[in-house]
Amino acid sequence: MDPHHYLIKFLRTSHTISAQQILICIIITAILLRVASALLLGNQVTVLPGIYDQISYDNLAQRVVDGYGFTFAEEHWPITRPGEPTAHWSFLYTLYLTAIYTLFGHQPVIARILQAIVVGALQTYLTYLIAEKIFAQKIGLIAAAISAVYMYFIYYGGALMTEPFYITAILWSLFLAMRMAEIDDFQQTIKFGVGLGIALGITVVLRQVFLLFIPFLFIWIWIARFRRRLHLSLISTGLSIGLIVLCVLPISLYNQSRFGRFVLLNTNSGYAFFFGNHPYYGTHFIPILHTDVYLSFIPKELRSLDEAALDQALLQRGLQFVFDDPRRYVLLSISRIPAYFMFWPSSDSSLISNIARVSSFGVTLPFMLYGLVACLGKKHVQTGNHLLNLFASPTGLLIVFAVIYASVHILTWALIRYRLPIDAVLIPFAAFAISNVFEQAKKKIDLVRTGSAS
């Protein structure tokens, strides 16, 4: 039979493929790529670019399994002494590894593969849901496809660090917030209030920095509901906040029992602010220094303090740096912007870091910016103040998150991996831009064909 017959038959059949089938294929692709990354990282936990923290989580989980609790056998970053309690690392992620090691023995590759499967499926699906909600189903599929093949997400998908689960939890929280902003039914608001509380609780226990965004999230929900003339859902908000407290409180009490002082979640904010704003930099931030350099910053009179006390003392010192020379702090913060949004290759980076950076953020950044600008100029409703309408829209929520989250790190300590949640949130805008570019190109091609035919 004529080969053209098969081609025509295939093209006709392809048009019958549903969006659901396409999405399933995209999700399977995302899972396979992340599982491949997990297998390449293997059963050894070694020093690799951008994922050094996995060594700490692996060691800490082994100590918990062996009955030593959250401690290290040797002096560990930042300056935690052997056998002394640590709260520097996410308890939830450590317990995830502990559960895997308890069930299967010290098999990091199993933790990697399970994580790759869960994150590959959920992060891709949530990206689709958010993009579909803001734009359209087609754009949701494009966004899911971008997320599936995004090199940073593939690389980190198998790394034993909080980032994969954390980014997924952020997307889950943002999507539930979008739903909360539009629901009128009381029972549904209660249902989504509970879901949002669980999502936010998981997110902050993975990385406490997200706590700084939560007030803005609820303010956005209230304003969005007010603009839609819906009740302010105070009961569902109270449920959400209550569930966050339930997630955080056990850790706070545990820290109190170990350190004899209040530690909300983790002992890392003081270290980060102190290290990130030390006069050593002058007005030019350097993202990564040698460990010995960081340790040399810590005053000798503070080195005898336990981890929690030292964290609080260093936060005070860091704030004093700002008060002593606010101009330097402003210039130093500005210098963090290129480091945070770096998309170009660097001779200081490894080959894998350069490939991941350029092939993911470097390729998608122009489309992200294109999509953002297009959305900023787009009218979401025909009446009312344009900026308020934009702010109260799901688009506005993603923009607010990106601005707040970037600002937090620009003002403290900026690393590329700290930007990855923003990448995930901006992917729907890149998908919108890609769709728009193809539509414009198609129109021009059709015009050329029409002109040629006439």
Residue ranges of each PLM-predicted region?
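Membrane-interface transmembrane helices that cradle and orient dolichyl/undecaprenyl
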Residues: 134-137, 173-193, 221, 227, ...
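Loop-to-helix entry region of an early transmembrane alpha helix in multi-pass inner-membrane enzymes
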Residues: 87, 91-98, 103-125, 144, ...
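Short helix- or helix-capping micro-motifs
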Residues: 30-33, 140-151, 155, 175, ...
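Transmembrane-helix motifs of polytopic, lipid-linked glycan transferases
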Residues: 113-135, 172, 176, 366-373
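Membrane-proximal stem/loop segments at transmembrane-domain junctions that anchor or position
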Residues: 256-257, 262-336
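Membrane-interface alpha helices of multi-pass inner-membrane proteins
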Residues: 98, 143-144, 148, 191-207, ...
